[in-house]
């Protein structure tokens, strides 16, 4: 499982390591955008993730802003656009993708969509307020990794991870008057 990879050199090293050791169950959490909508990575690192890691991963877990970048779309703000982005990401080489709609969609549900090139699985739960969600994306990709390590199929690992993160969000807590985090 990867997290934030801040340079193209680091992305190249991860790609070479995946190849060298013929790694399986590779979970890429692209971490290109945090709370806002602007890329926090230098452009060459983001482009390297797209070109070098997407084709090597078993699953990639972008939020909607990251998915728009990875799919070369101007924005991803609806369920239909999430599905379109998912198709493009898989067509670009990822074996599967789960796009985290979370709180970014204007619905009352936190919707994540899994796609493995064959079927879409929509996972919707009511949004949780207050939203102490710092670390939710990293927790989600780590929980998918744990499920795969325990022998679950990709779909089962994603579904279990969604339940785990939902519980962690329900018990989240404030860090200060601006942000709070998941509790797991």
Model-derived regions, located:
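Glycine/small-residue-rich loop that forms an oxyanion/phosphate-binding "nest" at active or ligand-binding sites
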Residues: 2-55, 59-62
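Glycine-rich beta-alpha junction loops
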Residues: 6, 32-34, 66, 102-105, ...
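Nucleotide and nucleotide-moiety/phosphate-recognizing core
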Residues: 19, 119, 155-156
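Conserved phosphate/ATP/ADP-binding segment of small-molecule kinases
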Residues: 43-119
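Short, small-residue alpha-helix embedded
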Residues: 68-69, 130-154
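Short, charged, surface-exposed loops that flank catalytic or proteolytic processing sites
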Residues: 75-82, 149-159
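Short pre-catalytic strand/loop immediately N-terminal to key active-site residues, enriched for Gly-Thr
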Residues: 120-134
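Charged C-terminal helix
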Residues: 155-184
């Amino acid at each position: 499982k990867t997290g934030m990879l801040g340079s193209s050199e680091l992305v190249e090293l991860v790609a070479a390591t995946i190849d060298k050791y013929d790694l399986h169950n590779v979970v890429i959490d692209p971490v290109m955008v945090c709370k806002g909508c602007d890329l926090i990575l230098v452009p060459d690192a983001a482009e390297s993730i797209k070109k070098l890691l997407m084709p090597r991963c078993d699953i990639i877990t972008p939020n909607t802003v990251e998915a728009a970048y990875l799919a070369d779309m101007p924005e991803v703000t609806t369920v239909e656009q999430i599905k379109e982005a998912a198709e493009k990401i898989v067509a670009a080489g990822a074996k599967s993708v789960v796009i985290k709609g979370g709180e970014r969609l204007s619905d009352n549900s936190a919707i994540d969509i899994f796609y493995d090139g064959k079927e879409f699985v929509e996972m919707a739960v009511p949004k949780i307020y207050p939203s102490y969600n710092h670390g939710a994306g990293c927790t989600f990709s780590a929980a998918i990794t744990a499920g795969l390590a325990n022998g679950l199929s990709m779909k089962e690992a994603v579904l279990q991870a969604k339940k785990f993160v939902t519980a962690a969000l329900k018990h989240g807590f404030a860090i200060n008057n601006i942000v709070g985090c998941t509790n797991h």
